[in-house]
């Protein structure tokens, strides 16, 4: 599941990526490592399905000049550990990642930890919550993060 998600992001298959999330799924990138709550707190990302769709529409629009030329991403996901499973088959999965982004003739590297709460459904798992903790969250960036890592 996690490897497929990384491939979907790298290939910019946004409809497939959104389909990995449950109807009330959340993508969360906290601004602090010890942050326990995302709702109502400062975050890099705290996005539900509606906000994710809005970001895709904005960044893929033909006149999204801030995204020209389009970036290229390459994810590596490793150290996948199933932390827990409940009686319903829902699981919490921890993993590590490295993402290289090539954009405007430069490469930016992002590394960190994922924590997924995956809800079991009749047709597979869906993301209820994806938490992405960046190792280099305090690093200086010439431009903001436009896409999910």
Can you say where each PLM-predicted feature lies in the sequence?
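Alpha-helical hinge/cap motifs
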Residues: 10-13, 123
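A solvent-exposed, acidic/Ser-Thr-rich amphipathic alpha-helical stretch
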Residues: 23-94
């Amino acid at each position: 599941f996690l490897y497929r998600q990384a491939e979907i992001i790298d290939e910019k298959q946004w409809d497939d990526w959104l389909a990995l999330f449950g109807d009330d799924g959340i993508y969360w990138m906290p601004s602090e490592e010890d942050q326990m709550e995302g709702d109502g707190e400062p975050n890099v990302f705290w996005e539900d399905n509606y906000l994710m769709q809005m970001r895709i529409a904005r960044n893929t629009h033909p006149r999204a000049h801030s995204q020209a030329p389009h970036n290229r991403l390459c994810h590596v996901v490793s150290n996948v550990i199933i932390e827990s499973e409940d009686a319903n088959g829902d699981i919490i999965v921890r993993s590590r990642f490295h993402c290289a982004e090539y954009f405007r003739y430069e490469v930016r590297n992002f590394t960190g930890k994922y924590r997924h709460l995956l809800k079991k459904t009749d047709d597979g798992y869906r993301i209820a919550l994806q938490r992405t903790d960046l190792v280099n969250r305090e690093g200086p960036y010439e431009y903001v993060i436009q896409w999910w890592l």
